[in-house]
């Protein structure tokens, strides 16, 4: 099973070597807590974008904190 890593730029969680959302290769194994965004127009997605501007632009799993 592939290890999930979080993008340091947009916080998207992926098993790939490149972030499918922003294209960054700067991924981390050291991330905490996650939010699953189904609707990018939801209040939670908008709140997430307030603290992480690049986050929650597409549905998926996002890390709250990435080191």
From Swiss-Prot:
Gene3D superfamilies linked to this entry: 2.20.28.90
UniProt keyword annotations, A-Z: Chromosome, DNA-directed RNA polymerase, Metal-binding, Transcription, Transcription regulation, Zinc
Keyword Zinc in record: yes
Domain of life: Archaea
Subcellular location: Chromosome
Kinase recorded as keyword: no
Effect of a null allele: Essential, it cannot be deleted.
Pfam family, one: Spt4
GO terms for MF: zinc ion binding
One GO cellular component term noted in the UniProt record for this chain: chromosome
GO process annotations (BP): regulation of DNA-templated transcription
UniProt-listed InterPro entries: RPABC4/Spt4 (IPR029040), Spt4/RpoE2_Znf (IPR022800), Spt4_arch (IPR007178), Spt4_dom_sf (IPR038589)
Residues where Zn(2+) binds: 7, 10, 19, 22
Family, similarity comment: Belongs to the archaeal Spt4 family.
NCBIfam families: PRK08351.1 (NF006224), RNAP_arch_Epp (NF041664)
Assembly with partners or alone: Heterodimer composed of Spt4 and Spt5. Interacts with RNA polymerase (RNAP). The complex interacts with FttA.
Role: The Stp4-Spt5 complex stimulates transcription elongation on both naked DNA and histone-bound DNA (chromatin), facilitating transcription through the histone barrier. Neither protein functions alone. The complex also stimulates the transcription termination activity of FttA, neither protein alone stimulates FttA-dependent termination.
Protein name: Transcription elongation factor Spt4
Organism: Thermococcus kodakarensis (strain ATCC BAA-918 / JCM 12380 / KOD1) (Pyrococcus kodakaraensis (strain KOD1))
């Amino acid at each position: 099973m592939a290890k999930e890593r979080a993008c340091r730029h947009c916080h998207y969680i992926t098993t790939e070597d490149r972030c499918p959302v922003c294209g960054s290769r700067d991924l981390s194994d050291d991330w905490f807590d996650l939010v699953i965004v189904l609707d990018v127009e939801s209040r939670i997605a908008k709140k997430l974008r307030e603290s992480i501007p690049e986050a929650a632009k597409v549905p998926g799993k996002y890390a709250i904190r990435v080191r």
